[in-house]
Amino acid sequence: MAEIPTWTPVVALALTDSDGRLLLQQRPAGKHHAGLWEFPGGKVEPGEKPRIALVREIREELGLEIDPAALSPALVTDETSDRAIVLFLYTATEWLGNPQGREGQEWGWFTSSEAAALPLAPMDRDLLARLPL
């Protein structure tokens, strides 16, 4: 009997401001790919819907409130050589609050060319290259 594949569902957000800049955060020390920049997001908990997981993660990480209905599915990328995950990227242009690095992470607003010049996590680099901006 074949084994059931094991992979971790992850959600991330390409949040764009009125100037067309993307919000990215830097992975904190002690985490996988520490120091690399990424789209904010995180793991989907068992039984949790992806949009709800993303709203929760954005609130926990950045203190922002996002309406799940304002999230648009954009791209999917799958496992890299070092991780068996499937990452679902959503886009949004509306939120409430001011970003704060609630987990000690650095964050910033970047144009797509500025973002491409950052040391990005591998899956995030793939997503950025394919994101229609």
What kind of feature is each model-predicted range?
Residues 1-22, 43, 74:
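Conserved N-terminal beta-strand and adjoining loop/helix that marks the start
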Residues 4, 31, 41, 45-49, ...:
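Residues at secondary-structure transition points
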Residues 21-61:
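Conserved Nudix-box catalytic region and its N-terminal flanking loop in Nudix hydrolases
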Residues 65-75:
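A short coil-to-beta-strand element that immediately follows conserved catalytic motifs
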Residues 89-91, 99-131:
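NUDIX/MutT-family hydrolases
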